[in-house]
Amino acid sequence: MKQWWFIILLIISFPLKADNIFVEAESFDCRGGWVLDNQSMGQMGSPYLLAHGLGVPVENASTVIRVENGGKYRVWVRTRDWVKQWDQTASPGRFELLLNGKALEVTFGTERAEWHWQDGGTICLKTGENRVELRDLTGFDGRCDAIFFTSALEMLPPDGKEELTVFRRNMLGLPENPEDAGEFDLVVVG
């Protein structure tokens, strides 16, 4: 009898595993008119996509995510409002996130000057392939670092650099230390 209580206690104590999908914006299949910007890698540990259209909205960036368990997910988009540091009220770097052709109700790039996870609300993802797009609204430097979908609706991804690095590594299944490829005098990339 005591064994059953112990098993029940274990089941109640550990929440069910959430379904998480972490998408680096720079890994989109098609960048459209968005460009890869790596100027903040020292601060963030990752490059991001930038919609630099000189006032003309750029072509959508797009990718496909594969969802094992369809259902309700919360969406988080890592972004920033680059003019908030000057106390500006307008947010020129606004963009939308489209899922399977439908824009979320939230406009991104409108909240804070520093990089952060902006809440996109809850959505329903279907099992299988789902198309994700970034739609620039202004052509004035919208910024997207990553998108995080989670079935743990109350979960907030970390913002601190060290915590985010560990989180990103875990979500992408990367090792803690890079594989040692040996010593070389010259490396040619490209």
Q: What are the residue ranges of the model-derived segments?
A:
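Sec-dependent signal peptide recognition
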Residues: K2-I8
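Short, flexible, glycine/charge-rich loop motifs used to bind or transfer phosphoryl groups or to couple energy/partner
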Residues: I11, L137, P175-N177
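N-terminal signal peptide c-region/cleavage motif recognized by signal peptidases
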Residues: S13-P15
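Extracytoplasmic
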Residues: A18-G173
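Beta1/beta-strand and adjacent pyrophosphate-binding region of the FAD-binding site
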Residues: P178-G190
